[in-house]
Amino acid sequence: MEKILQMAEGIDIGEMPSYDLVLSKPSKGQKRHLSTCDGQNPPKKQAGSKFHARPRFEPVHFVASSSKDERQEDPYGPQTKEVNEQTHFASMPRDIYQDYTQDSFSIQDGNSQYCDSSGFILTKDQPVTANMYFDSGNPAPSTTSQQANSQSTPEPSPSQTFPESVVAEKQYFIEKLTATIWKNLSNPEMTSGSDKINYTYMLTRCIQACKTNPEYIYAPLKEIPPADIPKNKKLLTDGYACEVRCQNIYLTTGYAGSKNGSRDRATELAVKLLQKRIEVRVVRRKFKHTFGEDLVVCQIGMSSYEFPPALKPPEDLVVLGKDASGQPIFNASAKHWTNFVITENANDAIGILNNSASFNKMSIEYKYEMMPNRTWRCRVFLQDHCLAEGYGTKKTSKHAAADEALKILQKTQPTYPSVKSSQCHTGSSPRGSGKKKDIKDLVVYENSSNPVCTLNDTAQFNRMTVEYVYERMTGLRWKCKVILESEVIAEAVGVKKTVKYEAAGEAVKTLKKTQPTVINNLKKGAVEDVISRNEIQGRSAEEAYKQQIKEDNIGNQLLRKMGWTGGGLGKSGEGIREPISVKEQHKREGLGLDVERVNKIAKRDIEQIIRNYARSESHTDLTFSRELTNDERKQIHQIAQKYGLKSKSHGVGHDRYLVVGRKRRKEDLLDQLKQEGQVGHYELVMPQAN
């Protein structure tokens, strides 16, 4: 007891008028009452703290020892720990601090004997151990504090949206995902080969290993209120925010100038978060102007108030069960199976049912049963309602049951009106002008072997609009109509995935019978008259060779006196024939660093070629070689724009080349093609008379 009093001497805990455990400050003229554990000598008055203002109450953390050896292990005593705790409290948020103080008082309430003025916790039955901490971040708290916390800490109110069973199931999934992350990090294939880890690939691979898929939700920063954007991200005005979720559990949010950048940033933060000690919590998050409960992953011991606003509506987060694939069902019991809408965006019946169930937010399940004749029976359940069944092997029975279920659902579907496609290609002519263009003036522009691309390029070349209109037929068959300037050109019937291609092909064939066709042969075969790198560099060499040495040059006179009569240097004339050209060095680089720039093309040479073409009357486009780099093609684009020319790159990778040409009107190009038959890589094919 004497050791404890010596350690507690001079500790000031401040004023706490709102708690009964701490005595209020005595009025003037009255002596301060001593507690029962103060002894005979009153504590000495201690000078003010050198650090910062203390909070109104702070728990006292001390180290008690029963021997001199234990005292020698901590030579600085409790003063050092008191300073560390003051720094810890200063950096804690206010809400965490209030919870901290409430837990500390709960600990005091759970013990029968303590010193009310000094704040020490004293027990009779259990000895005081060394290094006792009340911080929740300590990995090994004392048994007494654990019991006190379990008795006095109020349990959080249960969530009405997410039951405890759902939270426990999500916690198990996150633990499984965390173990998968650590396993992949130890895999040399994931980290070797490049200095930077592909976090998006790693997270997707780990989540798919847990038999589910990640969910990415994007939102433009312009649609997010400035107050909801982090302070360090307010410089981004045209960027995107990406929220990463998995099984409806919020992981992280990333911000960047593009969608892919925000996704990569969010996945990087998610992988780093999953490497820590984490847990699944139910917190209230802001969505636009409302608040709702959400499942989040946060680090153990950290507060949950720093989460950014949600990008997914709260009504889409209600989880009440799982489907056959393990995916969550969103408010599934509220819908009846007769309201099921089929979205035929797959080739087989199983894919159509699964995609339609995800679209309708309903549950679909396949149940198998072994029959006495060693065959399997598969039954399809939609919203716990048995639709159909199939027999055969385990694989064929599922397909048979899905086919029967799809036929039953198609009979219950309402009669849908014609569904217009959203593809509409418009030229630069104003649509609101009210002038309807005649199909007789149309010119087919063929730039690709794909009929859909040809039809879209034709509409853009003639400044017309093209639409694709779908109509549901019987079964899985659809009818697609091609409408050009409100006039039906062609139609086709087939599967929805391929019917558009077939209808566009019929439309192109119909138009070619009556309309002229302009064929762009640029992408077909090798391109002639290509400007190579050596040809561009040759212009600089020609200018250098123009610097001929005159007869009165001192070097020339010395060579003449030594017997040089012209040509190459040396006894047999095997040396250089032309004098060394003077090369300008504009930057502050040394001569040794100029080796890498030998093959670079000068900008003035490119500009000279394009300037000569712009001033000429040539109608043939300039085609630059595939040898040019991206930076060199970028310079050509800039120079072509400067002289009012159009430029476009074609090809992919090493086969990419650039074409510079004049801006031509459709009428001018047709007139030239009618006169000459072929202009550059353009060719005119007139319709053949029947």
Curated annotation (Swiss-Prot):
Gene3D superfamilies: 3.30.160.20, R3H-like domain
GO-annotated cellular components: nucleolus; nucleoplasm; nucleus
Active repression domain: annotated segments: 1-296
Location of this chain's protein in the cell: Nucleus, Nucleolus
Effect of G555E: Abolished interaction with DHX15
Disordered: region residues: 27-87, 132-163, 414-437
UniProt motif (Nuclear localization signal) ranges: 25-45
Biased composition (Low complexity): 142-163
UniProt cross-references to InterPro entries, sorted A to Z: dsRBD_dom, G_patch_dom, R3H_dom, R3H_dom_sf, R3H_NRF
GO molecular function: ATPase activator activity; DNA-binding transcription activator activity, RNA polymerase II-specific; RNA binding; RNA polymerase II cis-regulatory region sequence-specific DNA binding
Subunit note: Interacts with NF-kappa-B. Interacts with XRN2. Interacts (via G-patch domain) with DHX15; promoting the RNA helicase activity of DHX15.
Stated name of the protein: NF-kappa-B-repressing factor
Provenance organism: Homo sapiens (Human)
